[in-house]
Design a protein with these regions (language model features):
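A local structural micro-motif
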Residues: 31-32, 209
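Cofactor-binding loop segments of dinucleotide-utilizing enzymes, especially the Rossmann-like FAD-
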Residues: 16, 36, 119
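Short loop/helix-cap segments at secondary-structure boundaries that form the rim of catalytic
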Residues: 22-26, 43, 65-66
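Flexible, glycine-rich phosphate/dinucleotide-binding loops
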Residues: 20, 40-42, 123
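A short beta-strand-loop structural module common to alpha/beta enzyme folds
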Residues: 32-42
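N-terminal beta1-alpha1 ligand-phosphate binding loop
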Residues: 2-29
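Anionic-ligand binding patches
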Residues: 2-11, 45-218
Length: 218
């Protein structure tokens, strides 16, 4: 059984996303993935940025409630063009074709929300309080090129990004569809803003280097 020193609590990623797992593995290999029991629905009149932040916090707290000693990472990403209508994941080729046709020449705004939570201690109505909590939303602006149907079809043949809002993976071949990307954190668009997460882990006195060293020696 792997053990960590007392100053390094268990780290949990409240997500089953392979993209977020891959990003977190850049920082540490010592974490668990647990699926949060959260219904991901936009509330009436809720701004897309606010929805992303709410869901990130809900995911983290849903898992933290069951693992009170752990540091739990929650994240959510939403895309929009007007701030209020969320752009969903296409799910299949026909929807991805339509989404990329629609995105052609447009500027989309992606909001990647992050929550780091430990010790859900109380509930006040629907609000669950945590002993430690840090939250942030990192914005990314993506300008798409003018996309022909031929280019879209060739892209989807090579990289069927049906599980990505916007239907393109910036970390893969999808970069050829984009004219520009602007963000304070290049990892945010992939799904987990590592710059901000690193800062939050330091705030929580979680030492990435000692945690991995302890795991290697266990």
């Amino acid at each position: 059984v792997e053990t960590l020193p007392e100053q390094s609590p268990q780290l949990i990623l409240a997500s089953t996303s392979v993209y977020r797992r891959g990003l977190l593995e850049r920082l540490t290999s010592h974490f668990k993935q647990i699926s949060p029991d959260v219904i991901e629905v936009q509330k009436p009149g809720e701004a897309v940025e606010a929805m992303a932040l709410r869901l990130a916090v809900e995911k983290a707290k849903a898992v933290a409630r069951l693992h009170p000693g752990a540091l739990v990472i929650g994240s959510d990403q939403a895309a929009t063009i007007d701030g209020f209508e969320a752009i969903g994941k296409p799910g299949h080729r026909a929807a991805a074709m339509e989404q990329l046709r629609w995105a052609s020449g447009k500027t989309l705004h992606f909001f990647t929300a992050l929550a780091l939570v430990r010790g859900v201690t109380a509930e006040h109505g629907e609000q669950q309080l945590a002993a430690f909590q840090r939250t942030a939303v990192v914005g990314t602006t993506v300008k798409f090129r003018e996309l022909s149907d031929t280019l879209i079809e060739h892209y989807l043949d090579r990289e069927p990004a049906y599980d990505c809002a916007g239907s393109a993976k910036c970390e893969g071949l999808g970069i050829v569809l984009m004219e520009s990307i602007q963000s304070e954190d290049p990892t945010a668009l992939i799904g987990l803003p590592l710059i901000r997460l690193s800062q939050f882990l330091a705030d929580a006195d979680y030492d990435i280097f000692s945690a991995d060293s302890a795991a290697d020696c266990a």
